[in-house]
Amino acid sequence: MKIIVAHPQQQHSYRLATALKKRGELGAYATTVYMKPHNLTSLVAKALPSFWEKKAAGRHCDELDDSDVLQFDEARGLAVLFCHNIPLAHSRYDFIRRSTEDAFAEKISELVVREGADAVIGYDGCSASLFEKVRELSPETVRIVDMSAANALYLRTVYERDEALKPEFAESLKGWNRIWDPIDVARTKRELAAADAFLCGSEFVVNSLEYSEINRKFCEICHYGVDTESFPYRQRRGKEEEEPLTFVYLGQVSEHKGVAWLFEAFAGIEASRASLLCVGDVNLPESITSKLASNIDLRGMVQHDEVSNILLSADVMLFPSLGDGFPLSIMEGFASGLPVVCTENTGAADCIVDGENGFVVPVQDAGALRNRIEWFLSNRTEIPRMAKAARDSVAAYTWDAYYENAADAVEKLVEKVRHERER
């Protein structure tokens, strides 16, 4: 089987390409920006400040040979990165991103025909033109979406409900254009219509696709992995009643992560009982942040090597997201020995056994979240047991396991689509 993995940007596409290479099924990994000796990306990186050089260094995968990687529209891809990272260029970002996706799609569809690929795997939000072109030029090629997030059309319904329930937080929901921009909404609909099958990070992602009448028969779930060596485990001890518990949230402090419900749930808890540490970029107005209690600490962004120490010093992780496909921050919390309380709209809920390594609560329900916070405050002696169970939870979620599971899932999807076409 020959499979092409194509992404004009990055996300976790290196991981899937690696999985298929290990299985001997990778026809090519195609992208725009990638670090190779003497290419445009490496030359530009050397000419720019160290910030850009560090970002460029991340555009390389040691598991792939340079010969596995084909680059198209490299200059356009660099322009997308610049527009995304330079504030003065933000207004041009969406136009350049879309035009790059469309130009990239033309090249990949030609590659699919040239290579006689059995399947092409694109990524949600950037594959509408690719799948349409492949359907036209090589209709026998199976078109698979690797869903890095939940269905944007479903998420919009959740966000619209949240706007009505928490209007003061509504502005921070507007940052992800794929949800709101009519052009991107139309592209999402085209992408779903042109795809044959879906590789999903969680049951929640599958459920979100059912909103758009996608048949779950053509969905396969493959959970991501976690690097446990980067997140060491420390055995917890039961804290005394007079010692405050530390609850931690890891992710962007924005309403799409459900922080309004988090702050409401934590309101009125005395500092002598507990504190809430929020680690991540803050995307809320001062009119909200200035009113938070003193035991809610918005730490902001921290260095990657600091994250592990923060998780080791905490007692419980809270993750009240409105919708996340499979947040790696929860897996990092598990690896560090943190019981997790997350919403049903969080893909990592697949990994939680209530009362063992955490709890799953309804989305947009501050009362349910508060009940679980109070449960931990009243059942401190359970935390060491749950901490060990949390760490044990990630044993099955290594990247090596992902490589095997992802390759298996892709093979199943290809066979399902072929069988359906033969009927």
Residue ranges of model-derived segments:
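Conserved donor-binding/catalytic core segment of Leloir-type glycosyltransferases
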Residues: 239-257, 263-267
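Nucleotide-activated donor-binding/catalytic signature segment of Leloir-type glycosyltransferases, i.e.
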Residues: 286-308
